[in-house]
């Protein structure tokens, strides 16, 4: 085979694939000895193709590798990515959904499409004081929709909040934006779930939110529907209104107010603070309030991926597939 493994890596970099992503998709069984085996070279290319969403045929010759899902994506928000980067991002996400689906224990039920967020909220409130990030994740996994936080990003520059992806009849929610407090991520996951429930994804497609949906106040109809779903799930209202006699002077005042209001409203305090930020376009006060609402900042990605580690049936994967998924999830264990 004319293309060496090192040249293959360089060709992948020319597509915009990050070195971190190439390391993650590279099979753990690869060795210097494999370099001299034609069958190993072919298997290397098929493995990388499956994980990045590349056409296997394009990897066997000397032409530039091409993505299978070039145009099967919707990008919401201001994009700094060119067509090649968009193809890489959507193909990576769709391929990851395919691999994840092997270990998702719950079978996706088509009746999820059109699910009423108020009905889901009512179900969750039977066992929780309000709808929290862990409740949304539990519901999503229970519906057969895995949720993970990407610790390996396919592109060198990460400009993505989250994406909903579909491979055949399998869906997944992939979060990209880091957070230190759970409320913003709860909204992101609920928003992507809204895209899925509202039928915004045809088979083998990705919907990528590049900008912060709440802060953008988009007029895009699909974004409006996903926002409405998320807000009704989290708060019970499509347009929650937070009333003050006068605007909170600082984050401490806002934090105290939403913590008092959370129990009677059955809305998580951080979510209430974010509702104020959305309503008043005052995100500085909102972020200051979040720092007071929660005991301490924490890496929310670890929380999401610990849930995923528990939920996935690891016996469904080969050792190499399991190594790949753990790399994508940041190597999180149950501890």
Predicted regions and their residues:
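Active-site hotspot residues in diverse enzymes, especially metal/ion-binding acidic/histidine motifs
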Residues: 1-335
